[in-house]
Curated annotation (Swiss-Prot):
Key word Transcription present: yes
Protein name: Putative regulatory protein PrgT
Organism domain of life: Bacteria
Keyword terms, alphabetized: Plasmid, Transcription, Transcription regulation
Organism: Enterococcus faecalis (strain ATCC 47077 / OG1RF)
Induction comment from the UniProt entry of this chain: By pheromone.
Main function: Might be involved in the expression of prgA, but is not required for activation of the expression of prgB.
Gene, per the UniProt record: prgT
Length: 101
């Protein structure tokens, strides 16, 4: 997936959203399904792009330096959500309030 393809998908998605401001209210329409499909394609393409420049070594080095998760995401120039996905995809445990021990 290239940035050009992502740009085309974004434009199509925005055009569909602009044609009907209430598109999200009816999940059974073709418009809703197409918007969801485009959003997933864009997200998947973005995930592939960022994962190619994140290395386990750099991630672990940032952790050893004491950086918080949000700060590590900023170092990689990605969102915390994207870093969480990479984290999960690479076999790191996902901690939340209930299992931090």
């Amino acid at each position: 997936m290239t940035k050009k393809e992502q740009s085309i998908w974004r434009k199509e998605m925005l055009a569909l959203m602009n044609e009907d401001a209430d598109w999200y209210r009816n999940e059974d329409t073709e418009r809703f399904k197409r918007i969801q499909e485009l959003a997933k394609k864009i997200e998947t393409a973005s995930t592939r792009q960022f994962s190619s420049h994140i290395s386990k070594e750099r991630f672990e080095a940032y952790q050893r330096m004491g950086l918080q998760f949000k700060e590590i995401a900023e170092e990689f120039h990605i969102t915390t959500t994207a870093l969480q996905q990479w984290h999960k995809d690479n076999g790191y445990p996902i901690y939340n309030k209930n299992n931090r021990k």
